[in-house]
UniProtKB/Swiss-Prot annotation:
Protein purpose: Major role in the synthesis of nucleoside triphosphates other than ATP. The ATP gamma phosphate is transferred to the NDP beta phosphate via a ping-pong mechanism, using a phosphorylated active-site intermediate.
Record organism: Prochlorococcus marinus (strain SARG / CCMP1375 / SS120)
Lineage: Bacteria, Bacillati, Cyanobacteriota, Cyanophyceae, Synechococcales
GO annotations of cellular component type: cytoplasm
UniProt KW Phosphoprotein keyword: yes
Protein name as it appears in the record: Nucleoside diphosphate kinase
Length: 151
């Protein structure tokens, strides 16, 4: 595997329920490196760009309304195979179908309140990182335990 970056966002339901620390901890314990982090209430314009692939879907308006309804914690994580690993840690989109031990399986309520968003592939990750972060907001650093993280 190669070192890559992914975009994750703790949605307003996760922030309001006080799950930020729990979720951050899962990715830290997995050994991934946090290179970008900010909390914001997304603008309608940002939300519409982020969910643009769903523009023609009947749930688009509700999705945009929800993600702009409160604070979101936007993050960029880095590591070997981080995109696929993050998807596995997050679990299925529908919490009732997500495996126990995953974020959505343990913490999600329903498809509309599933706590977290994660990029689904390299192209999406690149698009979402560029949409939510300026390059100056991303930090290149090496953890002191780096030699224990990668071969």
């Amino acid at each position: 595997m190669s070192v890559e970056r992914t975009f994750l966002a703790i949605k307003p339901d996760g922030v309001q329920r006080g799950l930020v620390g729990e979720i951050l901890g899962r990715f830290e314990r997995k050994g991934f490196k946090l290179v970008g982090l900010k909390q914001l209430i997304p603008s309608k314009e940002l939300a519409e760009k982020h969910y643009g692939v769903h523009k023609e879907r009947p749930f688009f308006t509700g999705l945009v309304g929800f993600i702009t309804s409160g604070p979101v914690v936007a993050m960029v994580w880095e590591g070997d195979g981080v995109i696929l690993s993050a998807r596995k840690l997050i679990g299925a989109t529908k919490p009732l179908e997500a495996e126990p031990g995953t974020i959505r399986g343990d913490l999600g309520i329903n498809i509309g309140r599933n706590v977290i968003h994660g990029s689904d592939g390299p192209e999406t990750a690149s698009f979402e990182i560029d949409l939510w972060f300026n390059s100056s907001e991303l930090n290149n650093w090496n953890p002191s335990d780096q030699k224990w993280r990668v071969e």
